[in-house]
């Protein structure tokens, strides 16, 4: 049986961090962490599979430096060290990607497994692996042997969350690393969650009012034509399993398995730097908590050295520095998948779907679920010409509508090779050549060498015959089908721009009306706007770049003040405030006065920042809750979830859309307008603040509302009330619009949900150009000294220098080392 805590865990199920300790779902009891489960930091140990001795040193962060005489031995050791630090994460991500969580979690995980079997990441991974070069396959094989050397040596000393779950880990296969890459790619699928949410919202408000709730930048037309695709469809009753699918997708997105992953990266050209040499900055943002999926690694082998960000299970450095080139990645928010509504007819065990006026038999295959505590379950997965019919419930598709997911195929994709080649690129020019071969994942790649900077969009983007892909399209009509993919030479790029800097922060990076469609689900523009402000403010260096990464000033506050002062708003808003009951009127006036004086700095100790964020929360409820509520409804949850992944209706309405039907409060007989709702929101912000922070408004602090909760996604830790897995919550500043990002759920709670998990800066003017930090710890094992040891340095902005020159290794990593020798 699954543990009783599982039902509370599932709403946060699915991310790499969550999967890290999924194995403790068995409900075991855990004592203190066993140091025998931790890789030693020193000594000499034989290891079968090595050709020559390998040295592993660690810095104070726990980051390993692997020194070897051959690249083969370096990869083998990387597999061994990755497993030693993050074996729970690796196993959990693999089972999640395979759709096999119910083997350890029981029946409560079946819905997640059904969805993941439908998505079929194993097929994508197989295509990627088969398309890889023999060289790359050898690398993955050697890495897998290193993982398996750990699994064999520590078979009786695995971390407690793994060992006591009643699960015997299978050995790692080379293809499993391609599966981890496919899972990473799936985690960037912003639009899948949004398309499901759009159907839920359409059920509530109808197709006519749906366009106002879709992610649309202020300078773009609302997508009424896109919403018209749903007109005439009985969405409430005909779409099989929609509520289940949306609920599971929300659970997956809650911890970064669908669309939440964000990031910022930028490069400063020599003419903008104090030294006359380039700088590159990167931070990768994931849901807050223990532990981040990202960790650092450094490898030195003959003809190969690299330091940077890695994900355990994948023998690639995805963002890093090789001594000549620095590269980083951020989420494009690309839309390279589509949902299709399919008309389904069932006759006995035979399922057909409508395609251009004809009923066509659906392809099918069997899936077997080995459920812990139960009998095996065999179910059929059906596929149309667009892809598999998504399913999260035991109910097979019947007559009506079902949803098929179409994704690009990767049969000839060389992305895995390209990432390895990128880590060896000597300059920006070569980085462009290799990154254009990265087609399996949509990224903003930013590069820098000492003299040049560059930006390249990667991925495979479909050419849609009609429609934008914002909403599910009628699958029975071929006019919405894909017509190949955009040529990678058409992908946006830039090199050494006149302005002297390049930046990507999930914003729309292309002008309106660009010749190819990347997305309609862009992130908020404010982080990119703030980068532009600071990059243009003067010459940059390491110190100013650190300050940029920790900057907590939002440009959204200034935009809000502009709206309040606009000629058509200033007087009506004052009149609306004056018309409020006395208590509300006084509160609204106070809020208005303070917000107009607010400097936009969202520090944890700021009273005005607390008021500002209270206003944002209350305005969302005042605008939308009457139509989409209650707050527990699927429609409201869909609105809140979408605001965490893309530019939201909440922001869009505050800054514009004065003619939106949502300004009217449908629960009152009169018709409200925008000034009336803004006045109510101002008053409600103070009222809500009084209830949460007390009546002394000057004593309010944003950090008393907004907290970093350093809790493990490990369900066992939750059963035990925290214990060794968790760390104390701490006050946080910033929000989803600040460079030091700290997003919360807009329309729900104030707890920090997203935070920078790994930061990297490369300043080419320095003797040792690279510095970095992670926000939690290098290890996922609480028995390790490197579990959660980076929280305090992360809070204080204490970066670590990461030396690439051998003469500086001792200063960065010390003298202590673990020596691994060839075993017999």
Curated annotation (Swiss-Prot):
Compartment annotation = Periplasm
List, alphabetically, the GO terms of the cellular component aspect: periplasmic space
Q: Is Hydrolase a UniProt keyword of this protein?
A: yes
Q: Which GO terms describe its biological process?
A: antibiotic biosynthetic process; quorum sensing
* Keyword Signal set for record: yes
| Signal sequence extent | 1-26
Its UniProt entry gives the catalysed reaction(s) as: an N-acyl-L-homoserine lactone + H2O = L-homoserine lactone + a carboxylate
Q: Which GO terms describe its molecular function?
A: hydrolase activity, acting on carbon-nitrogen (but not peptide) bonds, in linear amides
- Name the InterPro entries on file: Ntn_hydrolases_N, Pen/GL7ACA/AHL_acylase, Penicillin_amidase_A-knob, Penicillin_amidase_dom1, Penicillin_amidase_N_B-knob, S45
Q: In which domain of life is the source organism classified?
A: Bacteria
The similarity comment for this entry is: Belongs to the peptidase S45 family.
The extra comment attached to this record reads: AHL-mediated signaling mediates quorum sensing in many species of Proteobacteria, regulating hundreds of genes, including many that code for extracellular virulence factors.
Q: What is this protein called?
A: Acyl-homoserine lactone acylase QuiP
UniProt organism field: Pseudomonas syringae pv. tomato (strain ATCC BAA-871 / DC3000)
Its gene name is quiP
């Amino acid at each position: 049986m699954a543990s009783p805590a599982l039902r509370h865990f599932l709403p946060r199920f699915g991310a790499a961090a969550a999967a890290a300790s999924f194995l403790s779902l068995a409900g075991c009891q855990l004592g203190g962490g066993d140091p025998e489960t931790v890789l030693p930091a020193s000594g000499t140990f034989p290891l079968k599979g090595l050709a020559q001795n390998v040295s592993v040193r660690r810095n104070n962060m726990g980051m390993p430096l692997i020194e070897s005489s051959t690249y083969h031995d370096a990869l083998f050791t990387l597999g061994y060290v990755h497993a030693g630090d993050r074996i729970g994460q690796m196993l959990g991500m693999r089972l999640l990607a395979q759709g096999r969580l119910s083997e350890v979690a029981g029946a409560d995980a079946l819905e997640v497994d059904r969805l993941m079997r439908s998505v079929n990441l194993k097929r994508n991974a197989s295509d990627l692996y088969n398309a890889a070069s023999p060289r790359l396959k050898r690398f993955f094989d050697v890495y897998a042997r290193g993982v398996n050397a750990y699994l064999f040596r520590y078979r009786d000393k695995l971390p407690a969350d793994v060992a006591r779950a009643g699960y015997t880990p299978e050995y790692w296969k080379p293809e499993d690393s391609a599966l981890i890459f496919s899972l990473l790619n799936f985690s960037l699928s912003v639009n899948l969650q949004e398309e499901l949410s759009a159907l839920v919202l359409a059920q509530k408000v109808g197709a006519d009012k749906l366009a106002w709730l879709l992610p649309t930048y202020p300078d773009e037309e609302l997508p009424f034509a896109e919403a018209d695709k749903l007109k005439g469809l009985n969405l409430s009753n005909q779409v099989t399993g929609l509520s289940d699918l949306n609920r599971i997708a929300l659970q997956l997105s809650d911890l970064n398995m669908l669309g939440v992953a964000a990031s910022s990266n930028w490069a400063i050209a020599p003419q903008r730097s104090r030294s006359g040499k380039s700088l590159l900055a990167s931070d990768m943002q994931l849901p807050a908590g223990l532990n981040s999926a990202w960790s650092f690694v450094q490898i030195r082998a003959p003809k190969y050295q690299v330091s940077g960000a890695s994900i355990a299970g994948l023998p690639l450095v995805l963002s890093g520095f090789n001594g000549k080139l620095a590269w980083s990645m951020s989420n494009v928010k690309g839309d390279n998948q589509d949902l299709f509504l399919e008309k389904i007819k069932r006759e006995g065990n035979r399922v057909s779907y409508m395609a251009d006026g004809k009923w066509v038999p659906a392809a099918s295959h069997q899936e077997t679920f080995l459920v812990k505590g139960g009998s095996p379950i065999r179910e059929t997965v059906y596929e149309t010409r667009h892809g598999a019919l998504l399913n999260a419930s035991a109910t097979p598709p019947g007559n009506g509508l079902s949803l098929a997911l179409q994704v690009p195929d990767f049969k000839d994709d060389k992305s895995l090779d390209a990432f390895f080649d990128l880590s060896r690129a000597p300059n920006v020019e070569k980085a462009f050549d290799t990154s254009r071969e990265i087609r399996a994942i949509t990224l903003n790649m930013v590069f820098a060498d000492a003299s040049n900077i560059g930006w390249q969009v990667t991925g495979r983007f479909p050419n849609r015959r009609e429609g934008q892909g914002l909403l599910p399209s009628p699958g029975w009509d071929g006019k919405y089908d894909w017509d190949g993919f955009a040529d990678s030479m058409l992908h946006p790029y830039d090199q050494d721009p006149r302005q002297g800097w390049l930046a990507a922060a999930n914003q729309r990076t292309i002008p309106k009306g660009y010749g190819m469609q990347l997305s309609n689900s862009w992130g908020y523009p404010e982080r990119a706007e703030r980068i532009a402000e600071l990059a243009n403010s003067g010459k940059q260096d390491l110190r100013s770049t650190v300050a940029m990464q920790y900057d907590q000033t939002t440009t959204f506050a200034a935009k809000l003040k502009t709206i309040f002062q606009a000629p058509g708003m200033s007087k009506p808003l004052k009149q609306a405030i004056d018309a409020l009951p006395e208590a509300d009127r006084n509160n609204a006036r106070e809020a208005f006065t303070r917000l107009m004086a607010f400097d936009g700095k969202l520090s944890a100790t700021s009273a005005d920042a607390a008021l500002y964020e209270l206003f944002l929360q209350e305005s969302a409820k005042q605008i939308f809750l009457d139509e989409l509520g209650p707050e527990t409804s699927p429609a409201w949850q869909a609105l809140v979830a979408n605001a965490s992944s893309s530019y939201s209706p909440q922001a869009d309405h505050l800054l514009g859309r004065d003619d939106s039907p949502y300004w009217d409060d449908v629960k009152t007989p009169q018709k409200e307008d925008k000034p009336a709702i803004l006045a109510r929101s101002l008053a409600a912000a103070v009222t809500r603040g009084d209830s949460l922070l007390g009546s002394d408004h000057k004593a309010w602090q944003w950090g008393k509302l907004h907290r970093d909760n350093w809790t493990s996604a490990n369900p066992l830790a939750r059963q035990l009330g925290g214990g060794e897995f968790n760390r104390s919550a701490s006050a946080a500043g910033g929000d989803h619009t600040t460079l030091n990002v700290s997003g919360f759920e807009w329309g729900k709670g104030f707890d920090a949900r997203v935070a920078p998990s790994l930061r990297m800066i490369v300043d080419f003017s320095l003797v040792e150009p690279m510095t970095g930090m992670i926000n939690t710890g290098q290890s996922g094992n609480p028995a390790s000294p490197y579990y959660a040891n980076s929280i305090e340095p992360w809070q204080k902005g204490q970066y670590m220098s990461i030396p690439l020159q051998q003469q500086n290794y001792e200063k960065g990593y010390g003298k202590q080392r673990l020596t691994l020798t060839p075993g017999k």
